[in-house]
């Protein structure tokens, strides 16, 4: 099943309904075009305004630019190792946890399209 594009208003509703940490993950997808799996696996030591990443799916190397405001928000909640720590000690947040929260938020606003974290990447 493919994800669909969201109207700006719908995207804002979904973002507002997410937990703060999952909202931040989706904002990174929105601002950078990265896949959710690549975002949640960012390490704290890699957090700079501009950095290189090897995309997990395509194995392509690309440069990522993070706006200062977003970078500051990520650093404020980052763990010792992972930029987006998970519930389990020593692990990063899972893409499935972000996916479930996005689905819940879309249902709360009765959005009919198939919404997933990938929907935010499509806007990039």
Regions picked out by a protein language model, each given a short descriptive name:
Residues 1-11, 85-91:
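Flexible interdomain linker/hinge and immediately adjacent N-terminus
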Residues 1-2, 9, 17-18, 49-71:
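Basic, Lys/Arg-rich DNA-contacting stretches centered on the C-terminal catalytic core
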Residues 4-36:
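Basic, Lys/Arg- and aromatic-enriched nucleic-acid-binding interface segment
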Residues 11, 22-23, 95, 99, ...:
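Short, leucine-enriched amphipathic alpha-helices that occur as contiguous helical runs
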Residues 16, 100-123:
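Short, basic (Lys/Arg/His-rich) helix/loop patches that form interaction surfaces
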Residues 29-49:
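Short, charged phosphate-coordinating catalytic segments
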Residues 56-75, 81-103:
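C-terminal catalytic core of Y-nucleophile DNA break-rejoin enzymes
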């Amino acid at each position: 099943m493919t994800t669909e594009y969201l109207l700006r208003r719908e995207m804002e509703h979904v973002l507002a309904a997410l937990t703060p940490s999952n909202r931040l993950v989706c904002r990174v997808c929105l601002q950078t075009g990265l896949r959710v799996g690549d975002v949640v696996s960012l390490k704290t030591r890699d957090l700079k305004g501009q950095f290189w990443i090897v995309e997990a799916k395509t194995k392509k190397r690309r440069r990522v630019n993070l706006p200062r405001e977003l970078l500051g928000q990520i650093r404020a909640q980052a763990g010792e190792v992972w930029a987006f720590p998970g519930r389990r000690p020593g692990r990063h947040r899972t893409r499935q946890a972000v996916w479930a929260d996005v689905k819940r938020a879309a249902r709360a606003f009765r959005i009919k399209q198939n919404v997933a974290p990938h929907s935010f990447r499509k806007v990039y």
